Each structure stands twice: as structure tokens, then as C-alpha cells.
Amino acid sequence: MAVTMRQMLEAGVHFGHQTRFWNPKMAPFIFGHRNKIHIINLEKTLPMYNDALKYVRQLAANRGTILFVGTKRQSRDTIAEAAQRAGMPYVNARWLGGMLTNFKTLKVSIKRLKDMEAAVEAGELEKMSKKEALLFEREIAKLQKSIGGVKDMGGIPDAIFVVDVGYHKIAVTEANKLGVPVIAVVDTNHSPEGVDYVIPGNDDASKAVALYTQGVADAILEGRANAVNEVVQAVRGGDGDEFVEVNGEA
């Protein structure tokens, strides 16, 4: 379902930051200011948001992986819920330096987490002393919080979706180094540089964050559904072909 400009207004997408904190590189996307707060031009935001979703659909249709990134308090739960619904990896605690550029090290931690989870399933905790079990539980909880959202990410993602590029500067920089496309919400106090699909908008309001993330999750599911429908149509199209038996005898 397409998002309307009214929905963006109701979610507060148009509210930027205080004018004294603005980044001049966001000037093309600013409508004006009110009470020393920049107002984002939604006539620019809406088509750019739709362009980003179009790219997301295409990527999902081709079985691409999109990593959701949002570690700010007001976006953590929303990011996790949307990513899980779309079957995509996510980072909603803290971005660990090297998550992309040093993926080999991350894989070691992921293996450790999976091994520990398997041990819990096998009832290994019951064989430990109270102290050992406590230390084990602390470690697994720490790993689940930091990398639980990426434990099923088999490799470098095909794109990352970021809410607040300033807060997640390291993630954007790592993606840029590896040539991984960046889809991001950029507020008036940050630069859109390094972002392939810019969504000019409020990156603080929970309603606005929910609108972006739910839209991206929906686009992923739509892209996958479209790909499945195309396969079904192709198979059905072949049913109508006349079957001709080839006789090998001369």
C-alpha cells in the first residue's frame, strides 16, 4: 500500500532539526523553517521514498539481503520488528566496528553464539555449576543483544537500510568501502553524501521511523511475492503448450 503525503505529515516526517544545526548539503530538500525548526519538503521526500522502495522491491525479488540498521532508543524495537517480519538481518543495539569490513571476525562470533544456543537446546546448562551457568548465560545474552539480529546473515548484505546516517556514520562508511548500496533516512542536520537512496526526513520521531521501516519491510515482502507470482505464471504459461512425442524410429 502506497504511502501518501498526508500520512507523512501525520507521522511528522517533515519536521527537521533546529536551523542552527543544519547541514547546507540538505538545502535542496528543505522547504523553509518555522519557529527555528527546518521544514522538509515532502514533495521531494515522497518520490525519493518511493524510488527507494522500488529499489528494495527489485532487490528482494532477486533474493537480495537488506541489513536494517537503527540503534537509537526510539527506533530499536521498530527496526527489529520490521526486519523480522521481512525475514532480514538487523542491528538494533550497537554497531560493532568491522561488522561489514571485517566480516570474518563477525562470523567467528556468530559461530560462538550458535554453538552456545545449541548447547542450551541440548541441556548442557544443567550439567554446569551455578557459577559456570551464570557466566554462560551472561555471555550468550551479550552475544544475542549485539549480533543476534545478524546471526543468519550468510555474508555481506546486498544493501543496508539506515535510520539516521549521523548516528550510524561507521555503518555507512563501511558500506561505502565495500560498495554496498545505502538506503537511508537523512535529517536536516546531516549530509546525504555516501547515500545511494536518500529519504529526506525526520529521523527522531517514532511515528516517522515506523512509517519508513514498515514501508521497507512491505516492499521486501511485495518484491518476493512478485517474484513467486512470475514463476507461477511462467509455469502455467507452459501448461498450454502442445506436447509432441518424438518418435525415434525412421
UniProtKB/Swiss-Prot annotation:
<protein>
    <recommendedName>
        <fullName>Small ribosomal subunit protein uS2</fullName>
    </recommendedName>
</protein>
<dbReference type="InterPro" id="IPR005706">
    <property type="entry name" value="Ribosomal_uS2_bac/mit/plastid"/>
</dbReference>
<comment type="similarity">
    <text>Belongs to the universal ribosomal protein uS2 family.</text>
</comment>
<keyword id="KW-0689">Ribosomal protein</keyword>
<dbReference type="GO" id="GO:0006412">
    <property type="term" value="P:translation"/>
</dbReference>
<dbReference type="Pfam" id="PF00318">
    <property type="entry name" value="Ribosomal_S2"/>
</dbReference>
<dbReference type="InterPro" id="IPR001865">
    <property type="entry name" value="Ribosomal_uS2"/>
</dbReference>
<keyword id="KW-0687">Ribonucleoprotein</keyword>
<dbReference type="InterPro" id="IPR023591">
    <property type="entry name" value="Ribosomal_uS2_flav_dom_sf"/>
</dbReference>
<dbReference type="GO" id="GO:0022627">
    <property type="term" value="C:cytosolic small ribosomal subunit"/>
</dbReference>
<dbReference type="GO" id="GO:0003735">
    <property type="term" value="F:structural constituent of ribosome"/>
</dbReference>
<dbReference type="InterPro" id="IPR018130">
    <property type="entry name" value="Ribosomal_uS2_CS"/>
</dbReference>
